[in-house]
Design a protein with these regions (language model features):
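Catalytic cores of the polymerase beta-like nucleotidyltransferase superfamily
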Residues: 1-157
Length: 157
């Protein structure tokens, strides 16, 4: 598994509030929950580019457990997108889209019927590009089930 060197410093320099993301993850420990940064922010971390979007996060807990943990930790959130397994966590100027790991059960081409999963590999199949399926944990370790890093670096050069 690859790791981003000097992860805390890189996050600070790029504007990712990793300390708060770790606070969210700590709140999930009762259920052995893990949280990952995913999507464009991971791409930007790898390329060492400034962050222009609020971090997208994904957790390996179902929505009910996620909401329970956040409420217990007094972390503010909005229940938007619940039927899609998604909420918004509020922190200072940030609005984190936090989504439970999901897999598609069926789709009509536009909307998918989803089911919770705790598998990065299954969740990654829903992502639009391979480099949007690179997951970064709170210590900077990268999980890359679809070889998105290779695609990202090819595109960069």
């Amino acid at each position: 598994m690859k790791k981003i060197n000097n992860f805390d410093l890189v996050c600070k320099n790029l504007g990712i509030p990793i300390v708060f993301i770790r606070k969210i993850e700590k709140s999930l420990k009762k259920f052995n929950g893990k949280i990952y940064i995913v999507g464009g922010n991971v791409r930007d971390l790898i390329l060492n580019k400034s962050i222009i979007n609020h971090p997208d996060l994904v957790v390996n807990l179902d929505l009910e457990k996620l909401l329970y943990c956040l409420e217990k930790a007094k972390i503010r959130f909005l229940k938007v997108g619940e039927k899609f397994g998604s909420i918004v966590v509020l922190y200072k100027k940030f609005k984190f889209d936090v989504t439970v790991m999901r897999k598609d059960i069926e789709t009509d081409g536009r909307w998918a019927k989803i089911k919770f999963t705790d598998s990065l590999e299954e969740d990654s199949k829903r992502r639009d590009f391979t480099f949007n399926s690179i997951y970064c944990d709170t210590e900077g370790h990268l999980a890359d089930p679809n070889k998105g890093i290779n695609d990202l670096l090819k595109k960069k050069s």
